[in-house]
Design a protein with these regions (language model features):
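ATP-binding N-terminal substructure of ATP-dependent carboxylate-amine bond-forming enzymes
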Residues: 1-77
Length: 77
């Protein structure tokens, strides 16, 4: 069985706990955030510089990465 993938929307300091928890649960973590200085990019397995409000970009990332789920944790858009 292959590793499950989760796309997390946003990589602020408040969201790092969700990224870490997903990794602890065995998920491959994919992150998207338009802020280039977000701390989550250093925790996630893969990072995309894309706005979480850009529905088309988020959809394309999810499709390309073949994620099993999408999580918005402590996001504010």
């Amino acid at each position: 069985m292959s590793q499950k993938k989760i796309l997390l929307l946003g990589g602020s300091a408040q969201q790092v706990i969700a990224i870490k928890t997903a990794k602890e649960l065995g998920y491959y973590t994919v992150l998207c955030d338009y802020l280039s200085d977000n701390p989550g990019q250093y925790v996630a397995d893969k990072y995309y510089n894309a706005s979480t409000t850009d529905v088309e970009a988020v959809y394309q990332i999810a499709k390309d990465e073949q994620v099993d789920g999408i999580l918005a944790y402590a996001s504010d858009p």
